[in-house]
Regions:
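Membrane-embedded alpha-helical bundles of multi-pass transporters/translocases
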Residues: 2-5
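PPIase-associated folding chaperone regions across multiple families
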Residues: 8, 12-60, 177-280, 328-400, ...
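Short, solvent-exposed loop/turn elements at domain surfaces
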Residues: 73-74, 86-95, 245-249, 389-392, ...
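Sec/Tat-exported extracytoplasmic proteins
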Residues: 81-84, 88, 131, 135, ...
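Surface-exposed intrinsically disordered loops and tails
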Residues: 102-113, 314-322, 326-335, 339-344, ...
Length: 524
């Protein structure tokens, strides 16, 4: 190889790394720019996503469910969910803790072992079913030009304003407090929407219900067609159950009972085991014998109930009214018992026994049947509220206030109108704007003490009195008599049937659908 060719080859080899380095340097610069741009976008996206996630954006801007043609955000679902929970809590009170663990997450507690459904699932279903009903009725209201009254709008504003007190106590503003109570993404805006739609639906439904009216002829025709639905019976009842025959025996030995050893001194109770067939035979024998021996002899029935009762219950049965069931409606009884008691051929003193599906025997003594054709009382009252009626100091203050109000009434013209004015000024009840008036009070509608005063047979218009209940102290005024109890029962039944027909036509099957992505942002 010549010297010149060798020289050229070395030049070519030397040039290769330079070209490669130049190419490498060129790719690195472009790639870096691209990577930086991509990373920047990703970082921004991540920051924005987490901001949207933590700020509640998704909870207020995505769709979690669709009801009656309305898309509900996760925040709106939260309101109905919380309402479903609160409704059950109000229904069961302190017993709620026996149904579920109120201190543990609901989505970790099984409601239905067969389906795996959790309590969170249950309340979600209840809430969305209610939401479907609410929006359907609200749409119907709007379609018919129905709007909230000024009073209802003011009530919504008052409810929102009241949140400020709780928010301030927790060092929060209104929005943050609503979010803390109902879940991330919940705000005054969405909560106001929830209050407006639920108030509108409730108000419109009430207006529809109260709008149904019936003539005397229609009421009379309904009663004649279905008297059992509106009459009431009075009877006596004694229950014969397994417990009457399952006695306990002391299995400890007398010699060991005197022992100083605690492990042997304690006696243990064992229950005499009877077969199901033996128990059934014993129960039927007692029930049939009691029914046969006490027919047309009410005192004999009372005595037999006392004799057959367990020793632990004899004190209760010593009260002759313990077995007495007065003015019972057909709808309040089991079908077998009701059918016998309401049989048109029934006469005073008739007896029978009926076994239910649980093996309990009802021994029955028929006394009378009422057509409930008597007038219902109209009563005004002024409530002096006492939060804790066991607080004697507070009760004494309430009694003094009640005496003062009654004295002021007696010093005036003693009219219903003047009592009503005093009620508006002094009552702690919600009906103050009506002058404390309750019309057509149904038997058992009020607490016992209040009810007994209203239905006292000696009661006359203008009567006054003071009654103490679990709510505090009531200044009472008997305003007179209203409608027939029977007619009221009939009218209520007709109204319920008509309202249910209207409701079903508007609401349908309460259908709803959920959106899995949106439901992820609900708070449970």
């Amino acid at each position: 190889m010549s010297a010149s060719r060798e020289k050229n080859k070395r030049k070519e080899q030397a040039a290769v790394p330079e070209t490669a380095n130049e190419a490498k340097k060129g790719m690195s610069k472009g790639l870096k720019t691209t990577l930086i741009a991509v990373c920047t976008v990703l970082v921004v996206c991540i920051v924005v996503f987490f901001y949207m996630l933590t700020s509640g954006f998704f909870a207020s801007h995505t769709t979690a469910a669709t009801v009656s043609g309305h898309n509900l955000s996760p925040a709106m679902v939260n309101y109905f969910y919380k309402n479903a929970y609160s409704t059950m809590q109000e229904q069961y009170g302190d017993f709620m803790s026996y149904i579920l663990d109120t201190n543990s997450p609901l989505d970790e507690q099984t409601y239905d072992a067969d389906t795996g459904e959790t309590w969170a699932d249950f309340f979600t279903q209840q809430g969305l079913t209610t939401a479907a009903e609410v929006y359907a009725i609200a749409d119907e209201a709007k379609a018919n030009g129905y709007t909230l009254s000024e009073k209802e709008q003011a009530a919504i504003e008052s409810q929102l304003t009241s949140l400020d007190l709780y928010a301030a106590y927790s060092n929060m503003n209104r929005n943050s407090y609503i979010a803390a109570v109902y879940g991330t993404g919940c705000s005054e805006k969405s909560f106001r929407e929830y209050l407006e739609v639920t108030t509108l639906a409730s108000s419109y439904a009430q207006s529809i219900n109260s709008g149904f009216t019936y003539t005397d002829a229609e009421i009379a025709a309904e009663y004649e067609a279905n008297p059992n639905s509106y009459d009431a019976v009075t009877y006596r009842q004694f229950l014969v159950s397994d417990s009457l025959f399952q006695t306990s025996t002391d299995s400890s030995d007398e010699s060991t009972a005197d022992s100083s050893d605690e492990s042997t001194a304690d006696s243990s109770d064992t229950t005499e085991e009877l077969s199901e067939e033996e128990l059934t035979a014993l129960k039927e024998e007692m029930a049939s014998t009691m029914a046969a021996d006490t027919a047309h002899d009410e005192q004999a029935f009372i005595n037999a109930a006392y004799e057959n009762a367990q020793d632990s219950a004899k004190e209760s049965y010593a009260d002759e009214s313990y077995t007495l069931k007065e003015d019972q409606l057909y709808s309040s009884l089991s079908s077998d018992v009701a059918d016998w008691l309401f049989d048109a051929s029934r006469t005073e003193g008739d007896t029978t026994y009926i076994a239910n599906d649980s093996g309990v025997y009802y021994v029955l003594y028929y006394i009378s049947r009422s057509t409930n054709d008597y007038l219902l009382p109209n009563v005004r009252h002024i409530l002096i509220s006492v939060s804790d009626t066991s607080d004697e100091t507070a009760m004494e203050e309430a009694r003094a206030k009640a005496d003062e109000i009654l004295a002021e009434f007696n010093a005036g013209d003693k009219t219903a109108e003047s009592f009503g004015e005093l009620a508006k000024e002094n009552t702690g009840d919600s009906n103050g704007d009506k002058g404390g008036l309750y019309e057509n009070i149904m038997p058992g509608q009020m607490v016992t003490e209040f009810n007994d005063w209203c239905f006292d047979e000696s009661r006359q218009p203008g009567d006054t009195g003071i009654v103490e209940t679990s709510y505090g102290v009531h200044v009472m005024y008997f305003d007179g008599f209203g409608n027939s109890y029977r007619d009221t029962l009939v009218e209520n039944a007709l109204r319920t049937a008509d309202y249910n027909a209207w409701h079903d036509g508007v609401v349908g099957d309460n259908a709803y659908t959920t959106v899995p992505f949106g439901m992820k942002f609900t708070t449970k």
